[in-house]
Amino acid sequence: MPLWKVPLISVMPDSPFLSDVPAARALQAWGSAREAGGCPGRLPAERVRLEDAAGRVTAEPVWATRSSPPFDAAGMDGIAVRAADTLGASETSPVYLQPDAYDVVDTGDPMPGGRDAVVMREHVHHAGDAAELRAAVPPYQHVRSIGEDVSTAELLLPEGHRLRAVDLAAAAAAGATQLLVRRSPVVAVLPTGDEVRPIGTQTGPGEILDTNSLMLAAQAREAGAVAHCLPIVPDDPARLAGAVSAAVASCDLLIIVAGSSAGRDDYTARIVAQLGTLAVHGVAVRPGHPVVLGVVDRTPVLGAPGYPVSAALTFDIFAEPLLAELEGAGPRRRQRTRARLARKLASPLGMDDWVRVRLGVVGGTMVATPLPRGAGVLTSLVRADGLLVVPAGREGHHPGEEVEIELLRSLDEISRTIVAIGSHDLVLDLAASALRSDDPRVTLASSNVGSLGGLVALRDGLCHVAGSHLLDPATGEYTLPYLGRILGGRDVNVIRLVHRDQGLIVAPGNPLGLRGIGDLIRPGVRYVNRQRGAGTRVLLDHELRMHGISSDAIDGYAREEPTHLAVAAAVAAGRGDAGLGIMAAARAFGLDFLPVTREPYDLVVAASEAESPRLAPLWALLQSDRFRGAVEELGGYGTKEMGRRIR
């Protein structure tokens, strides 16, 4: 019986099929399998021109064959002199040098014989043909001695060095025209799945675009490899086996995309075991658990999970170290920093949990805010400033706890970030884009945790700005009544962002004929709610009380989404019939909108931060007619009071 017809459930527990191997052990097991399978430890060397060597790794030490500079050279424009001839020169007692005692030189000129110093042109005064000097100069002032940069036979670069632009210039100055470097690794990316379609094609229900191959190939190129994507292979074990056999003949690493788990159509592990050696199937990391590591025909094979975040992190953990090893280079190490966690973080025991975070400096302290953690939420990697790894032995971290972050962006860029935590609104997304367009150094990083969560984060010093639209049912006011209750005596400013229309988001044409909140209890109406602590959730609960409706009577009340766009997406996909949200979200998905109320949405900021240079670009943006016009084009917004301080 072919191995791919053997059900995974029949595999013995001590087999490598879908286990929970710690990442470090998985790397060791894969390394042992590569060694036993005859995989090359390092790629062969080749000699390339300097012009083609950027990013390559040296295969031998680079020694200077000439000195640089190859002669004593003038380091400045001016006159070359004998330092001894300038002794005693001062403002009150200048020294005059006759034409035969100096030579005019430009930067880089060989030093004339008998001259050992250069006087800068701007320090030379002329009295007829004589040069008047008002200060003595020491020997070798502004003189570049032979070999100042590098001397003949000096080691310039070691073996295993990844070549940068400055390295190439130094090598050229030291006499090199070519360098011996390791051949660049060749990575083949093999996408699989009946549902996968090439980028640029129209997809129907149950079909997805092959974004993983694009991403993994680009990651390989960033790591110094030559990468190419192979045609998509359907979920057919015989065709997959043939594609794998053909691919390993012409690459140094084969990455098989998807099919790495233990589902009905997941064949990667069994094909690798049939064709070669299966070293590991299942690694104790999240996301990225169903990883396949093996060897086929002396070629390492990595089976990456189909979820994009899992695939990207799998490359970081397993593929990048292998590519560095093949080139004989050390692994690329990202900069690290310490940060305070903005909110509680729960993690499963037994797995290294890779959490994407946004970073910003608040009150002189680096703050990390976790991003959505789903393995399919690729935008969490797009927006991430860093990675927090919660080790397998921990169940998470408490708010305010100090953690170590692996940086994905520079500290300088992060230091300019405006951290906004609180209620979701599309205007903040628009502001983030506008700020970046005006000044690429400025980032507005929003985390959507609801109005209450934002005010708590502001109280705890974990953000610069909290977005809020909390309704106080007792007074009918928004946000202001909550400041004393949540922030205590903290001095804050409240800046009006917009007024916005809240209402029921329904399918086009309102097929159920809903008229308002009271219709949510009708049979067959499925509601999509916002999370606890969200201002929209508070508004819904207030409206339910006003209508005398119990939340238990609403089908879907317990189903929560984190943003207005997520609510609209659920309705658009037919997973719900109605949800309370803003008009702009309904318009974004081409849905109908039933108005319920118009409410203010405000930005709450600590008074100590309100006038800081960091926030100045945001306040300036809110006064911009261009930005206000862009907001109004979204629909359902009023900008008359935008930027006005209301407290």
Predicted regions and their residues:
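A ligand-binding cleft/hinge motif common to bilobed small-molecule-binding domains
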Residues: 467-485, 568-597
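Phosphate-interaction motifs
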Residues: 9-178, 337-342, 390-392, 402
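A conserved helix-loop-strand patch within extracytoplasmic ligand-binding domains
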Residues: 481-532, 622-628
